[in-house]
């Protein structure tokens, strides 16, 4: 995993798992709203009344409806080893 992905993937994954509503602003100013259904290296699937595939290169900002807590790197591993 590259350094650029080390924050992005856990952040998007937390938004997806917790089904947090998000507003996604595109570089052209358009605002999209919905929940993150899935994502990969290049796209995000945003679900509202329909699913939209949004290319990451077109995204300016992702704004969650509430605060998101993402696990610090290695935090989940410590919990598993302490069990």
From Swiss-Prot:
**A GO cellular component entry from the record:** cytosol
Spell out the CDD domains in the cross-references.
Hfq
A GO molecular-function descriptor: RNA binding
Question: Which residues belong to any copy of the Sm domain?
Answer: 9-68
Q: Which GO terms describe its biological process?
A: regulation of DNA-templated transcription; regulation of RNA stability; regulation of translation, ncRNA-mediated
- Pfam families according to UniProt: Hfq
The record's InterPro entries line, in alphabetical order, gives: Hfq, LSM_dom_sf, Sm
Q: Which UniProt keywords apply?
A: RNA-binding, Stress response
- Look up keyword Electron transport and say if it applies: no
Q: Which family does it belong to?
A: Belongs to the Hfq family.
Q: What does this protein do?
A: RNA chaperone that binds small regulatory RNA (sRNAs) and mRNAs to facilitate mRNA translational regulation in response to envelope stress, environmental stress and changes in metabolite concentrations. Also binds with high specificity to tRNAs.
User: Quaternary arrangement and interactors, per the entry?
Assistant: Homohexamer.
Q: What is this protein called?
A: RNA-binding protein Hfq
UniProt source species = Hahella chejuensis (strain KCTC 2396)
């Amino acid at each position: 995993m590259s350094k650029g992905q080390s924050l992005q993937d856990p952040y998007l994954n937390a938004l997806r798992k917790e089904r947090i509503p998000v507003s996604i602003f595109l570089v052209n100013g358009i605002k999209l709203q919905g929940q993150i259904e899935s994502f990969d290296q290049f796209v995000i699937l945003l679900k509202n009344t329909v699913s939209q595939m949004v290319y990451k290169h077109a995204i300016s900002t992702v704004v969650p409806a509430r605060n998101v807590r993402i696990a610090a790197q290695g935090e989940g591993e410590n919990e598993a080893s302490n069990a």
